[in-house]
Amino acid sequence: MTIKKYTLLTALSVTAFSGWAQGNNTTDNNNEMVVTANRFPQPKSSVLAPVDVVTRADIDRWQSTNINDVLRRLPGINIAQYGGPRQLSSLFIRGTNSSHVLVLVDGVRLNQAGISGSSDLSQIPISLVQRIEYIRGPRSAVYGSDAIGGVVNIITERETLGSTLTAGLGSNGYQNYNGSTQQKLGDDTTITLAGNYDYSKGYDVVAKGNTGMASQPDRDGYLGKMLWLGANHKFNEQFSGFVRGYGFDNRSDYDSYYYPGSPLVDTRSLSSRTYDTGINFSNGGYASQLIGSYSRTQDYNYDPSYGRYDQSATLDDISQYNLQWTNTYQLGLGNVGGGLDWQKQTTEPGTNYLSNGYEQRNTGVYGTVQQFVGPVTLEGAIRGDDNSQFGWHTTWQSSAGWEFVDGYRLIGSYGTAFKAPNLGQIYSSTYGNRDLKPEESTQWEAAITGITGPLDWRLSAYRNDIDQMIATRGVYPNSRYYNVEKATIKGVEWTGSFETGPLSHQVTLEYLDPRNADTHEILARRAKQQVKYQLDWQMADLDWSVTYQYIGQRYDSVFDPITYAASPVKLAGISLWDLAVSYPVTSHLTVRGRIANLFDKDYEMVYGYQTPGREYYFTGSYNF
């Protein structure tokens, strides 16, 4: 795509876009609009950072049963999970920590419970997801804390009128039932309702007790329920508004350390509620959006024999208030943007091992710019955050792209980012340290993109230096959080997509060197090499999908059950294949089948925790 074409698309984007949080699909993947990169709508092809978009059609074609199964297919992502679906998981982008990933839901920061400060995406129902926008690289200058490795924006709004009912069955007693509908009330109001129920008997995620704990022969299953309700209203040609609320309740079983004579805490019960409302304004080249949001997450871990309210149980109870005002203005051959973010988090006593309730507030102000100057694209952003705990923090980033030949572009970028410590890391009587400072990073990336015949490709090389990393020091019960580590992460990444007749191909080749800058040890649970291949085609009314992933060897730790001392252990590399097929029985009814881990490979993503092995799924969907 030439500079002239996406300059025109960007110039038209402000007036063409009706809802910033939702994104927009088009038939041309390069021209589809994304909102996550710079917080204003722009064609995907005009964004200098690497961007991937997953639609609901992709999720249905791949027949993914959880968000981690979707994200593992995308470039730059490693996932470590303590077993199978709904077990605790970590998401690593380009070798950074799982706490270095900013997760948004409909453009609003996800409420994160837990002392690690990481988002556990295994708990978000896949039926809630209508679209995912995924940005690799630093984005703290746009969003503030957490966006060191990248940003994942989960969009929940159904994009088309109509109704869908789905039922599915699968291995390990898996059941899923969900439905959604979007209907017009008059000419200017749209109502959306969705619900989901899923269940699995599960399997024993630690069958042999080889994590150092005693063997606990049982099934580690889960049960989840979700409800989503929203309304959009167009007041006139300039103003529109929305209100939405959603919640989910999950219960999952896991294997935990057991001490004879004491309760066995091996059940997690997570309840999450979120309520958003907002108003959009658009007039000529100017657009503005104001959103207010409230969410509360309650995360219990307990022994079901004693109950959630026994003294052996733990509860992370966090409320989050968000207010964000976003503006963009068409200026010249590009856009300028800016806005204000305000957030308050409060905790109840007991959360993250806190003896008292605490509160943390953050106010951020930012500005962005994108301009086209002949064959050159320029991007920049700057942001300041005032945090009630650690004060003022400034981040910035800049990028430039030069289309030196029609269809080929050189890109260079540099940016700073940070991760603020959470309330548990600061105030916990067990692990806390009130002198903690934010983690900081500096990153650069050089890339070349091109369209060579049918092949649309990108080659990137990057380096990320992270300082003041937060980690525990000492052996339990005398361990504390400190700013003690540094990391240097280097990587090379090639992505390409092309079509050969009816076949659609997507390929990712990655080499990653993530190291502790002081000890030069490889960071845990990151693969140095990954190969990902997605093949989709249609034949005789059958839609086929084949997924291949090679994950190189990784390093993990095994802990002595008496001394808690850690020893390194190597996890072998693995090649995984998935096969999925769907068939439209009628114009309304589609049946789908999937085999996950086609060759029944035995592997681990976290040492000692089993993955499910080969699994079978069958689903039917009815649209009307």
UniProtKB/Swiss-Prot annotation:
Membrane topology: Multi-pass membrane protein
Residue ranges crossing the lipid bilayer per the database entry: 163-170, 174-183, 189-200, 222-232, 237-253, 268-282, 284-301, 314-330, 333-342, 358-374, 376-386, 390-405, 408-422, 440-449, 455-464, 481-498, 502-517, 525-537, 543-557, 568-582, 595-606, 612-624
Residue ranges constituting the TBDR beta-barrel domain according to the UniProt record: 160-624
Gene3D superfamilies found in the cross-reference section: TonB-dependent receptor, beta-barrel domain, TonB-dependent receptor, plug domain
Residues bound to Ca(2+) 1: D204, Q216, D218, D220, D255
Keywords, comma-separated and alphabetical: Calcium, Cell outer membrane, Ion transport, Membrane, Metal-binding, Porin, Signal, TonB box, Transmembrane, Transmembrane beta strand, Transport
Signal peptide start-end: 1-21
Molecular function per GO: ABC-type vitamin B12 transporter activity; metal ion binding; porin activity
Keyword ATP-binding among UniProt keywords: no
Family: Belongs to the TonB-dependent receptor family. BtuB (TC 1.B.14.3.1) subfamily.
Official protein name in the record: Vitamin B12 transporter BtuB
Lineage of origin: Bacteria, Pseudomonadati, Pseudomonadota, Gammaproteobacteria, Enterobacterales
